[in-house]
Amino acid sequence: TPNSYDMEYIPNLDMRSYILHHDINKLTEYIYGVITTLKSTTTYTIDFTDIYKEKLTKIDFDNNFIFDKETLLSKLPKSIPISEYHGDLTLDNILYSLKDTDFVLIDPIQTEYSSYIFDIAKLRQDLKCKWFVRNESNIYMNSKLAIIDHELSKFEYNDDYLLILMLLRILP
């Protein structure tokens, strides 16, 4: 039918299961490799100020926030490299193929955040803020996520304000 896709089913582990039962080094290397590959496609930089402003107009900054829109806008990096990107690089969108014993990225999207930099920020909502395991607590999981987050800290623009921007889009 039009506007539908037929995708192969991949027998897999989701990242929650993988992280709990496997060594974290293979996943860390995979994520680092994905980001490095995306970064290698950088062509030029653009100023994202107008895109930030547009996105922030949709957020209701009430008294529950410790800063206002202008403060956040002033802290965000403006000139960002344009590159290939996933668009929704979260741990929920990485599977471990049991057949191929390797990782598979799923569900890429097009977005105005057209840089690997925003993929890092989205990934950090899972690594630093534990979004994908928000309904459970596991110290073992937390320590493994911290290892991956530490590896991502080697990339430029590993920025907490970009992380805040990504979190604002999913707040209730």
Where are these regions (language model features)?
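Long, hydrophobic, amphipathic alpha-helical segments used as structural scaffolds
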Residues: 1, 39-46, 131, 135
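Conserved short submotifs of the Hanks-type protein kinase catalytic core
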Residues: 2-14
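Active-site acidic catalytic loop and adjacent metal/ATP-binding pocket
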Residues: 71-118
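Active-site activation/catalytic loop segments of kinase-like enzymes and analogous catalytic loops
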Residues: 113, 117-155, 164-172
